[in-house]
Amino acid sequence: MNHEIIEQRAWLMGTLIAIVISIGGLVEIVPLYMQASVISPSAGTKPYGALQLAGRDVYVREGCYLCHTQMVRPLQAEVERYGHYSIAGETVYDHPFQFGSKRTGPDLARVGGRYSDEWHKIHLNNPRDVVPESNMPAFIWLAKGMVDPAEVAAKMRVLRKLGVPYTDDDIKSSAEVVTGHTELEALVSYLQGLKYNGEAGQ
């Protein structure tokens, strides 16, 4: 087929472009859904607890993902700094995933357990109290905002429809778990849960 015939007919060129993109997309995407390692949780991966889930939503609402990633790349420097590189099975319960796109601040995929709860609270209230050169904003209002138990239960029901294995008991007990907790405590709980749960040596 002469290329001039295609170039002179916009509808034909558009149709051929759509066909090529569709085939390319299928070739790239479909195999991923056939790999169990991509769609199955990795060893030790569990759904977020009620307080962690509330904290994850605070993390998203405050735009933390704009400056922090949650994906350790398989590069020597990153593995030495942050720990085991991220694997697909770690994020199967993340809706939406929190890979992020820019590292103004450090990667948080392995931050759980590195610092105390108190350190995180001080850091979130005024980052420069613990990291003098930090350009992170202070989130002082989180200590005043309370977690809404009804909202957490509703989110857990929605996530269950998306495939997260929350039980009826998990949802019923969520109100008791989060009642009386501030958004600051919820965010700290979420951050403390960000760690590699796979088997040693993997």
Q: Positions of the model-derived regions?
A:
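Short, solvent-exposed loop/turn and secondary-structure capping segments
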Residues: 27-32, 69-71, 76-81, 135-136, ...
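Electron-transfer interface patches adjacent to heme c in soluble/periplasmic c-type cytochromes
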Residues: 13-22, 80-184
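Electrostatic cytochrome c docking/interface patches
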Residues: 36-60, 72-79, 104-106, 174-177, ...
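Post-cleavage N-terminal segment of exported redox proteins
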Residues: 1-48, 162-167, 188-202
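Sequence context of c-type cytochrome heme-c attachment sites
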Residues: 32-43, 53, 69, 88-98
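The canonical Cys-X-X-Cys-His
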Residues: 55, 61-70, 120, 187, ...
